[in-house]
Amino acid sequence: MLDLFHGFNWDLGNIEKCRKHGVSTDEVESLFESDDLRIEPDIANSKIEKRFNAIGKTAKGRSVFLVFTIRNHENEILIRPISARFMHKKEIDYYGKENSRI
């Protein structure tokens, strides 16, 4: 999945939003290396820019829910994380029925 993008667009704002929920930048980035990554458009929250929801496991094996957008910065396509949090047990159970690896 990462081969479609040039990297990530981090700043203090989105780093802090992820840290607030205990998720590091390394964990967010490792989601995109996961074989079980699921990405869906977030239509309800895409009024200003297209947003996406992603779920998957980090390199540490922790299930994470991520909201992100795609940015074009200096002719590079970047993933811009907006917020990330660990998935609740109910979410893991729900998505686990569809994808047993999450």
Where are the language model's segments positioned?
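Ribonuclease/tRNase effector modules and their secretory precursors
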Residues: 1-102
